[in-house]
Amino acid sequence: MAAAGPAAGPTGPEPMPSYAQLVQRGWGSALAAARGCTDCGWGLARRGLAEHAHLAPPELLLLALGALGWTALRSAATARLFRPLAKRCCLQPRDAAKMPESAWKFLFYLGSWSYSAYLLFGTDYPFFHDPPSVFYDWTPGMAVPRDIAAAYLLQGSFYGHSIYATLYMDTWRKDSVVMLLHHVVTLILIVSSYAFRYHNVGILVLFLHDISDVQLEFTKLNIYFKSRGGSYHRLHALAADLGCLSFGFSWFWFRLYWFPLKVLYATSHCSLRTVPDIPFYFFFNALLLLLTLMNLYWFLYIVAFAAKVLTGQVHELKDLREYDTAEAQSLKPSKAEKPLRNGLVKDKRF
């Protein structure tokens, strides 16, 4: 396997900073970079794209074909596998309508996160334990190792599919607009980080985010399966409770602790030490910061749910992002209006 760079810096892996050190050093590095940029503007951006971006048309075509492939595969899996399974298990109608979406996402994110974990812990890549190493030996147009390129193709094409799926296939939720923005930002980050050869940090970002989606969809599946066929299944209820606790913990630990202190610290501060004139520094850090803000936004849902459980307002697990029955009825179009279908699930609500 091609090595991505030295396993450590001259003095070994740098200790992970505190939040205060991240803000102080990251902000200081950004200010220094802004002051030192004497020709910042569209001219510099155009030169940077011409000199440092390497993305061939066949690669974009492959990405688009992959997105179409994911969409076709999901439609086939929903019709041939997930819906028949929901019917055979006698799920309640509302749960049976939502189960295919969660099953699809659970299988994808379980596979993608497992592969990212393999790259970070089953190979020689040192990026998790030594995040600054993501920029060691960086050069414009450097070769992308095949194992990382495969991960990028799978993830990039899936997020291309997810933009379409959020609009036309998924259940419409209170955060669907933010989810759509998240998918667009993620796709831009995947494509641009590949073009500028920041793929090493990209693998770390994907690893730190996908685990929460695995646990979220696992929990939702067990919620759907705990009441079926006129019976209450305690094993699924227990799995849902444990999954909910694990999901909340992993969201904070992976997305709000490790992600800023490993990824944002490396991109905002350490990158300039390794590559002083690193191209599109502000562009990538702005997108990563936006991703952090969206992680905080969704964490508020987790905190709100925990508060409702502790105060006795909620007695069973539910997705606070989903519209309840009363809201759904009030948001449905009148009979005289043309109904807007949300893909395979239900009416879409704006």
Curated annotation (Swiss-Prot):
Group of enzyme by EC: transferase
Domain of life where this protein originates: Eukaryota
Localisation per UniProt entry: Endoplasmic reticulum membrane
Keywords: Acetylation, Disease variant, Endoplasmic reticulum, Epilepsy, Lipid biosynthesis, Lipid metabolism, Membrane, Neurodegeneration, Transferase, Transmembrane, Transmembrane helix
Modification after translation: Acetylated. Deacetylation by SIRT3 increases enzyme activity and promotes mitochondrial ceramide accumulation.
GO cellular component, one term: endoplasmic reticulum membrane
Chain ranges of the TLC domain: 97-311
Catalytic reaction list: a sphingoid base + octadecanoyl-CoA = an N-octadecanoyl-sphingoid base + CoA + H(+); sphinganine + octadecanoyl-CoA = N-(octadecanoyl)-sphinganine + CoA + H(+); hexadecasphinganine + octadecanoyl-CoA = N-octadecanoylhexadecasphinganine + CoA + H(+); sphing-4-enine + octadecanoyl-CoA = N-octadecanoylsphing-4-enine + CoA + H(+)
Keyword Disulfide bond carried by entry: no
GO BP, sorted A to Z: brain development; cellular response to dithiothreitol; cellular response to mycotoxin; cellular response to UV-A; cellular response to xenobiotic stimulus; ceramide biosynthetic process; negative regulation of cardiac muscle hypertrophy; negative regulation of D-glucose import
Disease per record: Epilepsy, progressive myoclonic 8: A form of progressive myoclonic epilepsy, a clinically and genetically heterogeneous group of disorders defined by the combination of action and reflex myoclonus, other types of epileptic seizures, and progressive neurodegeneration and neurocognitive impairment. EPM8 is an autosomal recessive form characterized by myoclonus, generalized tonic-clonic seizures and moderate to severe cognitive impairment.
Protein's recorded name: Ceramide synthase 1
Native organism: Homo sapiens
Gene label: CERS1
